[in-house]
């Protein structure tokens, strides 16, 4: 059975072995550790922290001896002064070793893969990619998160399916991987506790955008899974953390480099997030669209991203000779129904009534909609003029849906799972004035004037001829010698 390993009891086998030679869990930070004020001063003044310094700081965070002000000061010093690759690698490793580790059967060593996204609007890739990879022979122990702010959370989307349970123990995760080949679960407090503390502190100290801290947060949570390979979807654009491709590339290179230094093969895909991914935004609506993609249909941009990311993972983990061959295998899993079959198994294994799981995975789009939460009202917006759709801005659309109850402003806030929006047009399509271009699903009264204006301003029209919408995929950053 899968087990949680406490610090000091050993580490998962390679390639998930990131403990370092002679290291078992989080070691004593130093025979004579520096005091926290001295560490903060060093980094504030642009100094380089040693391994003992970083491990001492992480140990103080976990054992409670670091005060909140000291944690915030260190985070700001790192944000302003940065960290080199070795410092970032040590921080990542120390965070990962601050809690318990997942351990899997030796036979699974090369099968374990996962994906992470920096967050976007309409991003339902994980719902499709995990079962597609399982259908290709992988094991996918996906530990995911909830939405906060304008981006949606994978766990929230799955919880729009009645009965789906995201709380699973390590032992239950192994059963799920045996039965379905994949699982999508929430973060356990036993795993990477130091990251949980630092993440909360970053959120209130304006240090969320620090590259070393982002890298350590992402990779520490993946290292404990004992993966063979990881792909990270680094988004850029108007609704992403990074406004442009250059900044996203900097994070991508850091993720790949730190992963390589810790024995984890990481690829990072740079993808555009100016418009929503696919045509649907909102929890239940995105589940419907994910099912459509697993029918072998659905929006081309969603399918393209699923096959691109999946192809990279199959290549990195040795399940395909090239990225293109891997992408073709993922596409075949979408077209032949095997990905949908794995999704049905995952639903049933994670608490969904088997009859409901079967109905969702075998029903028509109209039948599926009857089985998932639905908003009480629908409201369509009309094109204000003739023109070609240049862009549908994702950020204002997401912010209005957030106001309507599709998002949360604080942890634990309830969601309206049926609230969302459907794009009725594609980028590059010619529109006539008065044609419906957006359908809003709402529980409350009609859209307010400011909400309607914000949505209409999200639609960008031009006079140019119709054109084929570009793929959101821009670039793939690979590990050395790959």
UniProtKB/Swiss-Prot annotation:
Homodimer. May have a role in maintaining the integrity of the blood vessels. Has growth promoting activity on endothelial cells, angiogenic activity in vivo and chemotactic activity on endothelial cells in vitro. Catalyzes the reversible phosphorolysis of thymidine. The produced molecules are then utilized as carbon and energy sources or in the rescue of pyrimidine bases for nucleotide synthesis. GO terms for cellular component: cytosol. This is Thymidine phosphorylase. Substrate binds at residues 116, 202, 217, 221. R-A-L-X-X-A-L-V-L repeats lie at residues 393-401, 453-461. GO terms for molecular function: 1,4-alpha-oligoglucan phosphorylase activity; growth factor activity; protein homodimerization activity; thymidine phosphorylase activity. Residues 1-10 form a propeptide. InterPro entries: Glycosyl_Trfase_fam3, Glycosyl_Trfase_fam3_N_dom, Glycosyl_Trfase_fam3_N_dom_sf, Nuc_phospho_transferase, PYNP-like_C_sf, PYNP_C, Pyrmidine_PPas_bac/euk, Pyrmidine_PPase_CS. One of its GO terms (biological process) is angiogenesis. The modification Phosphothreonine is found at residue 6. Residues 1-36 are annotated as: Disordered. It catalyses: thymidine + phosphate = 2-deoxy-alpha-D-ribose 1-phosphate + thymine. Pathway: Pyrimidine metabolism; dTMP biosynthesis via salvage pathway; dTMP from thymine: step 1/2. The keyword DNA damage does not apply. Belongs to the thymidine/pyrimidine-nucleoside phosphorylase family. SUPFAM superfamilies: Nucleoside phosphorylase/phosphoribosyltransferase catalytic domain, Nucleoside phosphorylase/phosphoribosyltransferase N-terminal domain, Pyrimidine nucleoside phosphorylase C-terminal domain. The keyword Transit peptide does not apply. Changing residue 199 to A: Abolishes catalytic activity. Its EC number is 2.4.2.4. Keywords: Angiogenesis, Chemotaxis, Developmental protein, Differentiation, Disease variant, Glycosyltransferase, Growth factor, Neuropathy, Phosphoprotein, Primary mitochondrial disease, Progressive external ophthalmoplegia, Repeat, Transferase. It is an enzyme of class 2 (transferase).
